[in-house]
Amino acid sequence: MLYCAVVIFSKSYCPYSKRAKSILLEKYNIVPAPHVVELDQHAMGQQLQSLLAKNTGRRTVPNVLVNGKSIGGGDDVTALDEKDELASTLKNLGGKWIQEVNRKDQKKQAE
């Protein structure tokens, strides 16, 4: 079984989920890449959402987990990004499971 340090629990139609996915998947280069679980398209979506609520105290989506710890939802991911704290948060919580995290625009500037 493949271990993924960053998992985004989402619903395909949710604007907050779209924003979090856009930041994590398009704005950042994260290795290994985050795994997205679309709860509205998953056969066990309702059960997973209930389990997330029980384990993280958060029933709403998106719910972004790093090594099993919730860092919050769309507003939280946006705030971490705007404060330039998202990469360090992912690295700190991801530990040995996160090989690389950087903003794609910063990577281009460095080249």
Spans of model-derived segments:
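Thiol-based oxidoreductase modules, predominantly thioredoxin-like and allied folds used
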Residues: V31-Q47
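Local sequence-structure signature of Cys/Sec-based thiol-disulfide redox active-site neighborhoods
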Residues: M1-H35
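Amphipathic alpha-helical protein-protein interaction segments
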Residues: S10-Y13, E38-H42, A79
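Short amphipathic alpha-helices and their capping/turn residues within compact interaction modules
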Residues: V6, R19, L25, N29, ...
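Short coil/turn segments at secondary-structure boundaries
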Residues: A20-S22, L48, N67, D76-V77
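Thiol/disulfide oxidoreductase modules built on the thioredoxin-like
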Residues: L52-T60
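Beta-strand cores of modular interaction/reader domains in eukaryotic scaffold and signaling proteins
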Residues: V7-S10, H35-E38, N63-L65, S70-I71
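Non-catalytic, surface beta->alpha helical segment in thiol-disulfide oxidoreductase systems
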Residues: V66-K107, E111
